[in-house]
Amino acid sequence: LTLLAGTALADETYVTVYNQDLGMIKQVRTLNTRPDNRPLRFTDVAAQLIPASVHLRTLTGGSNLQVLEQNFEFDLVSSEKILEKYVDHPVEIVTEGGELVSGTLLSRKGNSLVLKTAAGIKIMAFNDKLSIQVKELPQGLITRPTLIWELAGQGAAEEKLEVSYLTAGMNWQAAYVGILEDEGKSVDLKAWVSIDNRCGATFENAHLKLVAGEVHRAAEPRAVQRMLKAETMAEEKAAPQFEERRFFEYHIYQLERPTTIKDNQIKQIALFPDVTVKSEKKFFYNASRDPKKVEVRLVFKNEEKAGLGKPLPAGIFRLYQKDQKSLEFIGEDQIEHTGRNEEVKITVGNAFDLAAERKVIEQSKVTSRSQRQTIEIELRNNNPKQDVTIVVEESIYCGDWQIESSNFTYVKKDINQVEFSVPVKADGTAKLRYSLLCRW
């Protein structure tokens, strides 16, 4: 006799989802572990379970239970598997016309079946118009992924066990929706988390945690590969109930109520209440990204006085703006994990009325290990009503460098980047010119 431990018998289920196609599952069961109920079979585990990560321990005091052997069985029932196991065994086939053909299955390859019948060898086209009957399920095939343990020790009729494991096929990311107000001076922000479960198991009434941060993982091949199936999407519109806290060098978001995470489902839950954040629309020119275009970005500080001040997990930030009676999509960008008091820059798109052109107008050798360049950047504003300031981002890779002169103020951002702020009048043009000395 074996004991089947299914999801319905779960005392508690804990699910932790990472940003890296990884989930941590912990389930507590009260099971009969006495010798007459062994081996112990534990079903409804994730199909993409990582076997080497499985950990079984007893929570019952005084128990002497020990694990001698562990097996992860994932040879699941399918028509292909059944026929594969029935090679050299008798089968019965009913054709489209109702004819019964009995014989020994010799081969099932591609779109054909080869049978040895009393009349000889028969080759039949394999399609959905055939009905194939077999006596029983072949040994070794199972209906659900299963963990099987061989145990030592006396055990108990009611022993509380904790099973934990890692699984591939689980992911989450944040999704942000921002509605621009007052010409970009503020943004109404909604934040969601999207949990994508394709691990091959459903977790009922689970205690959910999300880990924001990059966990280092060793390069190890997955134990099981699965085809992606059709997915459903569930959206939870209730008030946000995530508690956020620091954990090691990461951030954890814990849902304060149980939730069911179905297999092949994307679940969306509000991350925090809607907020209005002070923001600024800025224009940037970076010739290394696009030599002709000027980008428009929405910039805000992730701080309390701006209306936010919360750790922002990595995700896609989508922006909308009102046009008369409707909202229109104006652009999206990917943001990285962003801590409190850090600046967020969202590239919305290219400014239609702004253009730029960069030229090296002079270049001379100063010494055998240095040279001087004069660079000119022309910025054009074709909007007849709006003055703008364009931030010019210049990337410099020439060892030791020095800006000898510039007709606009600049800030050295780091060892390889400098920024110039250039005001451009409506329907006007401005030229940035600076001299660069490079040494190597």
Language-model features, listed with the residues they occupy:
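Short beta-strand elements of extracellular/lumenal beta-sandwich folds
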Residues: 27-39, 185-198, 285-286, 290-305, ...
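Low-complexity, acidic Ser/Thr/Pro/Gly-rich terminal tails and inter-domain linkers that flank the onset
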Residues: 18, 166-184, 341-369
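Beta-strand-rich interaction surfaces with strong enrichment in secreted/lumenal proteins
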Residues: 28-32, 80-82, 150-151, 177-179, ...
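Intrinsically disordered, low-complexity Ser/Thr/Pro/Gly-rich interaction regions
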Residues: 207-211, 227-365, 390-394
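Solvent-exposed beta-strand/loop surfaces of large extracellular or lumenal domains
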Residues: 19-22, 58-83, 131-139, 212, ...
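C-terminal soluble interaction/assembly domains
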Residues: 356-440
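Post-signal-peptide, soluble extracytosolic/periplasmic N-terminal scaffold domains
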Residues: 9-188
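Short acidic, flexible loop segments centered on an aromatic residue
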Residues: 18, 47, 55-61, 166, ...
